[in-house]
């Protein structure tokens, strides 16, 4: 019966339930319940000297009744528990002054057999694992109390402990529950792995590789520690604990989340946005708002599914990815100008409301893993908006997915923009061309009309993100982009290992058209010695070769080619953007308010003079400057030594 009921328990991982625990149940031996100890729960069994009669006492009431019989028969002088009131469940009644059921006191109790012979308690104790297994009942004094409502706490919805407990707590819980109630003691369970050192060795003070958790908590905080442990590996896997990983979580995830909130709070306070304003309908908001809200609700859906599956690791990773890639690095960065200056227009209000919703929802989603910073963000947001009556994120309802706001096509389109942008930025880094330096063009080969339509919709967005003047879409890459193909041994090997040499030889001779067909089609059938081999694009590694004056990158079905030729005009614009960066830094370091107008003087050099002449208006717009000039000797309120491309220059900034 224990094996049958075990199959109804949801084990994470499943292999522990079917393997380690299941095999243990299949080969189980009788449980030797007694232990020769002093401290613990005494066996409630009394026996005559010849062991012909045994009594197992089931309650204090029964014990006191048996003691009274023994006293009446003269076997005991008096009842040691005479002051105890049966039925009185108060702490005072259960004080050790009234009753103590431990050794040595219980050893002095002598009961009376049915034949009038004295009965003494078996001297052993109960195995402490029986105490642990009885925890569900003992914690509420069942069945002597809490009969009503017991079914609300039993069986437990969820428990977690180390995998070594398959023969300990997991077993005793299960055995007692099956014996007493023909039931399971728990419905869902995670068997935790071990925490090892960063090299995968068991931590030991003797070896000096132990990490003091209190030191980690003090230095990095509980949130970062918890997030690292949950996101780094699934709970049932062994965790190679590296303090540097905790610090990375603190900087990357929590630093990004806090900076995003700080950005929102800064401009919301300037504009007087509270979060209590009438909502701009989602359908009236810009596409970028609808996209992030779609991604947000997909996030809620994914995180909820992971947590309901008792798998918090993918949940943490999805939240991390959303905050870092979608919210901070994409939405906020592409929408900064919507928050700057001007009146609180409907467009700006939509931006505030969208970012507010994202921050609030992320705080609520992440709260079970990072309880402190999420509660701080939730409370700060709610203090001005009053959207929630609950004073803490931990009292609020968990977010629910709004399926109506999920737009899969919009997400796919924006994902394409993100991937293309990421690839172009990686190409820039490859040759040390800063993003502030504009380039002329990127070429993207399109495989079908849908891909072309998606890129057209995000054309301007990608151009702004990677700072290029144009995107050219092509269908024929002949003479422009040369691709190479080879088998992906990780995916093809397990399926067609004995044919790998033939497959490699076959695709090595593929034309550009054949390679393009593999990228475009869902499946490609190869004929190897009469054997039909079904493959997908993922079964091959397809790379692109650089062209003269261009850099090329491929990722899956997406290929981009970047023109890295810098003309004089592009160079001047790049210098202008560098000047904007330097002036913004001076504004910040000099303590200017974000709304302050300024005047700017830039030292005239061969680099700066042409740039200022061509782009003075652009520089002024970006820096809230009323005047921008290139002069021989800059003078003003703040004169700062700076440089561009390691060429020194002075910049003067004065509050206008």
Predicted regions and their residues:
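Residues forming anionic-ligand binding surfaces in small-molecule and nucleic-acid pockets
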Residues: 1-15, 152-153, 553-569
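Short, solvent-exposed helix-loop connector elements
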Residues: 10-16, 237-246
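Feature 926 captures the class I aminoacyl-tRNA synthetase adenylation module centered on the KMSKS loop
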Residues: 23-130, 134-136, 180-222, 237, ...
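Cytochrome P450 core scaffold surrounding the K-helix E-X-X-R motif
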Residues: 139-144
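A short glycine/serine-rich beta->alpha loop
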Residues: 153-164
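Substrate-binding cleft of carbohydrate-active enzyme catalytic domains
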Residues: 174-179
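Structured mid-domain segments that build the active-site/substrate or prosthetic-cofactor binding neighborhood
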Residues: 228-231
